């Protein structure tokens, strides 16, 4: 059977950036991976409707517990609030939750945690698969017909200027006894082309008939169209 690789992981270092920036000893690698995963999950669960596409975590010093978090989101006000102290409150809450995370797992606390937090807006939010998937999940959970929801998702993406998109829904569609998959595709989606700027997201939708699996691939154009430094 054919094996499918993750579209973003397939292009790391080519057209996709890494989401974590740090280098440490093998003893600390496992700990830093755990707390980075915890912070990402906590932020995404707390701000479900904010349209968070990805979160970058940076660490500069091996011996220091300081870290920087950069959130890329479609709706900044939902995260930062109306005043300038919204980010400060979130920053304090993240430090507190991280300390609780260490205590619950009997991990060695690194000392005073210095956390820098920033939020960056997205130029065209509906050109990102994560934002489109969140909206599609919301519509399906509100019992909108899945074919109409898929078509509207494609239309929103095309209006945002994407070159191509594929939307797939799997599960008991319309309450059918046998699960199946249906997809809608518009434009090219070259998954095997490394220079293609492909964005991908997969999410579950909890409906009255059970879970539906949602996958969205977005093709935003090609990068690395020429190589000028090779002779």
Swiss-Prot record:
Belongs to the universal ribosomal protein uS3 family. The lineage of its organism: Eukaryota, Viridiplantae, Chlorophyta, core chlorophytes, Trebouxiophyceae. Residues 39-123 form the KH type-2 domain. It is found in: Plastid, Chloroplast. Part of the 30S ribosomal subunit. Its main location: plastid. GO terms for biological process: translation. The keyword Calcium does not apply. GO terms for cellular component: chloroplast; cytosolic small ribosomal subunit. Coiled coil: none annotated. The gene is rps3. It holds the Pfam family Ribosomal_S3_C. GO terms for molecular function: rRNA binding; structural constituent of ribosome. This is Small ribosomal subunit protein uS3c. Keywords: Chloroplast, Plastid, Ribonucleoprotein, Ribosomal protein, RNA-binding, rRNA-binding. PROSITE patterns: KH_TYPE_2, RIBOSOMAL_S3.
């Amino acid at each position: 059977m054919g094996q499918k690789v993750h579209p973003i992981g397939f292009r790391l270092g080519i057209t996709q950036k890494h989401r974590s920036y740090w280098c440490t000893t093998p003893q600390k690698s496992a700990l830093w991976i755990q707390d980075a995963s915890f912070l990402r999950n906590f932020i995404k669960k707390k701000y479900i409707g904010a349209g968070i596409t990805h979160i970058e975590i940076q660490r500069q010093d091996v011996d220091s517990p300081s870290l920087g978090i950069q959130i890329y989101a479609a709706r900044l006000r939902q995260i930062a609030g109306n005043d300038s102290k919204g980010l400060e409150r979130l920053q304090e809450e993240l430090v507190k939750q991280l300390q609780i995370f260490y205590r619950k797992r009997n991990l060695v606390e690194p000392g005073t945690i210095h956390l820098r937090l920033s939020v960056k807006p997205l130029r065209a939010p509906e050109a990102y698969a994560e934002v489109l998937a969140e909206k599609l999940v919301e519509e399906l959970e509100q019992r909108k017909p899945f074919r109409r929801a898929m078509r509207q998702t494609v239309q929103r993406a095309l209006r945002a200027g994407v070159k191509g998109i594929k939307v797939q829904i799997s599960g008991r569609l319309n309450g059918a006894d046998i699960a199946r998959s249906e997809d809608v595709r518009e434009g090219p989606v070259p998954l095997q082309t490394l220079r293609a700027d492909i964005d991908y997201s997969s999410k579950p939708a909890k409906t009255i008939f059970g879970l539906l699996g949602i996958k969205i691939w977005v093709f935003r154009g090609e990068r690395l169209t020429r190589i000028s430094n090779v002779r």
